[in-house]
Amino acid sequence: TLKPNESAVINVAYCALRLDEQFNLNFKNEQACREDFIKKLDDTLIIKTPNEHINLMARYAKIRGCESIFKTKSGLMHSPGGGNYYAALWTNDQCEYINPLFGYLGYEIGEQESINCYEMYRKYIYDDRAVITSIVAEGDDIWHGAKDRGDSAMYAYGLARFLLTYGDKQLAKN
């Protein structure tokens, strides 16, 4: 029982492992890594408006966007979260919205994820029909929702913005 003015720290870890993997968790080390991660993000793309609430929301959105990248069997994948869509890519969430931001941030993991995302979608680009809506199950399956050109437009728009902000001419030529 805590007495007035006392505090306690409770550490929680959400983890997933394959049966043959081992996991050693050092909460002090994890806390130090997280603080370093956030410090680095705080030094990039700082939004300053007259409204401190908007500034703080932009900071939190940047952190959340950068911490939502997972190593999968198909490479790095950004997930929109919510607990339902891990190891899946969407033309709106990843291709159009978050990936172009990574070109501005200089966040290497985000840049690698973006390149992987666009490459994974490349094999689903057709001349006669729309690009798929989502790549799911670590890249093993797809979901082709709307089946209209909206997903194709989101992919193309996001890719163009990412390539312009990332600034790699050779990658753009590919």
Regions of interest found by a model, annotated:
Residues 2-18:
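Short Pro-Gly-centered flexible turn/kink motifs
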Residues 16-55:
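Terminal connector regions
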Residues 39-173:
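Substrate-binding groove/exosite segments of carbohydrate-active enzymes
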